[in-house]
Amino acid sequence: MLLCSLTLMLLWMVASGLECDTKEVCLGSPGIPGTPGSHGLPGRDGRDGIKGDPGPPGPMGPPGGMPGLPGRDGMTGAPGLPGERGEKGEPGERGPPGFPAYLDEELQGTLHEIRHQVLQSQGVLILQGSMLEVGEKVFSTNGQSLNFDAIKELCARAGGHIAAPRSPEENEAITSIVKKHNTYAYLGLAEGPTAGDFYYLDGAPVNYTNWYPGEPRGRGKEKCVEIYTDGQWNDKNCLQYRLAICEF
């Protein structure tokens, strides 16, 4: 039995030697572990990792200190849009009465200058024959020829009326203006509801006339009156163009 065991061991050893020769490596059984080595040097820093999720908010900090001083005023801004107009206020109290006009030397001086200028203007117009004074009336013309309604409106805008003689003196003054312009002129008269009855434009009946012989004879168809260059009157329709003479 012992012999058999020795034989088997010998065969195993021979086989093991042949295996070493063939592979040039001999496989032995693991040895006893050695002692641990010393710590090596620290490795290099690794690359930055991926950005992580935000963390939760931290707790509220303590209150700050006292507020600082106010800053300086800024630059003035651009003006805004105008606002809506407010309601009209109540009238104020009535002031004390002023001084009478005759006590105001400056006003009196101004009025005196105005009167002087008016008199000068009247003198120039009188010399030109475009204005004549008779009593408290002034007769004037601008030389235009218009129909009756247009003359009436023209004189009203100037603050007067169509010339209407109420005396021989006034009729003569109007006649002299007509002669100067060598034309006829309308008078401030109009026929009433009854043919042949004429009135002043204020509705008063005519108290002075100087009709041409046989006039008026329009029989209600000629409502206006014209004056000839000899001062006599004739009834006429109101659409003709005649010299505009106003009285003031």
UniProtKB/Swiss-Prot annotation:
<comment type="function">
    <text>In presence of calcium ions, it binds to surfactant phospholipids and contributes to lower the surface tension at the air-liquid interface in the alveoli of the mammalian lung and is essential for normal respiration. Enhances the expression of MYO18A/SP-R210 on alveolar macrophages.</text>
</comment>
<feature type="compositionally biased region" description="Pro residues">
    <location>
        <begin position="54"/>
        <end position="65"/>
    </location>
</feature>
<feature type="compositionally biased region" description="Low complexity">
    <location>
        <begin position="69"/>
        <end position="82"/>
    </location>
</feature>
<feature type="binding site">
    <location>
        <position position="215"/>
    </location>
    <ligand>
        <name>Ca(2+)</name>
    </ligand>
</feature>
<feature type="compositionally biased region" description="Basic and acidic residues">
    <location>
        <begin position="84"/>
        <end position="93"/>
    </location>
</feature>
<feature type="binding site">
    <location>
        <position position="234"/>
    </location>
    <ligand>
        <name>Ca(2+)</name>
    </ligand>
</feature>
<dbReference type="GO" id="GO:0005615">
    <property type="term" value="C:extracellular space"/>
</dbReference>
<keyword id="KW-0479">Metal-binding</keyword>
<feature type="signal peptide">
    <location>
        <begin position="1"/>
        <end position="17"/>
    </location>
</feature>
<feature type="binding site">
    <location>
        <position position="235"/>
    </location>
    <ligand>
        <name>Ca(2+)</name>
    </ligand>
</feature>
<dbReference type="InterPro" id="IPR033990">
    <property type="entry name" value="Collectin_CTLD"/>
</dbReference>
<dbReference type="GO" id="GO:0007585">
    <property type="term" value="P:respiratory gaseous exchange by respiratory system"/>
</dbReference>
<feature type="region of interest" description="Disordered">
    <location>
        <begin position="29"/>
        <end position="103"/>
    </location>
</feature>
<comment type="similarity">
    <text>Belongs to the SFTPA family.</text>
</comment>
<dbReference type="InterPro" id="IPR016186">
    <property type="entry name" value="C-type_lectin-like/link_sf"/>
</dbReference>
<dbReference type="InterPro" id="IPR018378">
    <property type="entry name" value="C-type_lectin_CS"/>
</dbReference>
<keyword id="KW-0106">Calcium</keyword>
<dbReference type="InterPro" id="IPR001304">
    <property type="entry name" value="C-type_lectin-like"/>
</dbReference>
<feature type="disulfide bond">
    <location>
        <begin position="224"/>
        <end position="238"/>
    </location>
</feature>
<comment type="subunit">
    <text>Oligomeric complex of 6 set of homotrimers.</text>
</comment>
<keyword id="KW-1015">Disulfide bond</keyword>
<dbReference type="InterPro" id="IPR051077">
    <property type="entry name" value="Ca-dependent_lectin"/>
</dbReference>
<keyword id="KW-0732">Signal</keyword>
<feature type="domain" description="Collagen-like">
    <location>
        <begin position="28"/>
        <end position="100"/>
    </location>
</feature>
<keyword id="KW-0325">Glycoprotein</keyword>
<dbReference type="Pfam" id="PF00059">
    <property type="entry name" value="Lectin_C"/>
</dbReference>
<dbReference type="GO" id="GO:0005771">
    <property type="term" value="C:multivesicular body"/>
</dbReference>
<dbReference type="GO" id="GO:0005581">
    <property type="term" value="C:collagen trimer"/>
</dbReference>
<keyword id="KW-0272">Extracellular matrix</keyword>
<feature type="binding site">
    <location>
        <position position="217"/>
    </location>
    <ligand>
        <name>Ca(2+)</name>
    </ligand>
</feature>
<dbReference type="GO" id="GO:0030246">
    <property type="term" value="F:carbohydrate binding"/>
</dbReference>
<keyword id="KW-0176">Collagen</keyword>
<keyword id="KW-0767">Surface film</keyword>
<dbReference type="InterPro" id="IPR016187">
    <property type="entry name" value="CTDL_fold"/>
</dbReference>
<feature type="domain" description="C-type lectin">
    <location>
        <begin position="127"/>
        <end position="247"/>
    </location>
</feature>
<feature type="glycosylation site" description="N-linked (GlcNAc...) asparagine">
    <location>
        <position position="207"/>
    </location>
</feature>
<feature type="compositionally biased region" description="Basic and acidic residues">
    <location>
        <begin position="42"/>
        <end position="51"/>
    </location>
</feature>
<keyword id="KW-0964">Secreted</keyword>
<feature type="disulfide bond">
    <location>
        <begin position="155"/>
        <end position="246"/>
    </location>
</feature>
<dbReference type="GO" id="GO:0046872">
    <property type="term" value="F:metal ion binding"/>
</dbReference>
<protein>
    <recommendedName>
        <fullName>Pulmonary surfactant-associated protein A</fullName>
    </recommendedName>
</protein>
<keyword id="KW-0305">Gaseous exchange</keyword>
